[in-house]
């Protein structure tokens, strides 16, 4: 809602199922954001969504090693994550993505900054894929044969 109030146009695709889906749906409706959010549920192949995104946002209070963040990295998505243990281990702030506090103001400010800076998003996307390939060179065979 903060982004919409600032005039930032964004469409959110939410993939996956979870116990908070109904809570999220109610929040979307309460804030009048029905046209801005698309809740797709579980999808067989999430990669086309990663490929089309301008920014992958992973805002969570707690996280271990996130497979979704790894997928976004290998597919070259610019990434914004919230500041928690697992996320900090996967994304180096200002190097291969951006890390911010998990507050509406901080997340919305970072999203706005990144959406306005295409060059920075491209840098983060390239670096995130490179970083993952350096860490796990064998992963390349899973995506490119």
Model-based region annotation:
Residues 113, 120-134:
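A short, well-ordered alpha-helix in the C-terminal region of glycosyltransferases
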Residues 25-41:
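Nucleotide-activated donor-binding/catalytic signature segment of Leloir-type glycosyltransferases, i.e.
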Residues 93-94, 98-104, 113-118:
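Conserved acidic donor-binding segment of nucleotide-sugar-dependent glycosyltransferases
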Residues 42, 61:
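Aromatic "clamp/platform" in nucleotide-sugar-dependent glycosyltransferases that forms part
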């Amino acid at each position: 809602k903060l982004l919409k109030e600032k005039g930032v146009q964004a469409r959110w695709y939410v993939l996956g199922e979870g116990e908070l889906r109904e809570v999220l749906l109610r929040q979307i409706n309460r804030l009048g954001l029905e046209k801005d959010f698309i809740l797709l549920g579980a999808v067989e192949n999430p990669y086309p969504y990663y490929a089309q995104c301008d920014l992958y946002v992973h805002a969570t209070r707690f996280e271990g090693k996130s497979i979704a963040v790894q997928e976004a990295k290998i597919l070259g998505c610019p990434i914004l994550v919230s500041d928690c243990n697992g996320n900090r281990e996967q994304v180096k702030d200002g190097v291969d993505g951006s890390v911010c506090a998990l507050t509406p103001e901080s997340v919305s400010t970072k999203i706005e900054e990144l959406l306005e800076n295409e060059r920075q998003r491209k840098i983060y996307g390239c670096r995130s894929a490179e970083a993952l390939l350096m860490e796990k060179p064998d992963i390349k065979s899973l995506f490119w044969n």
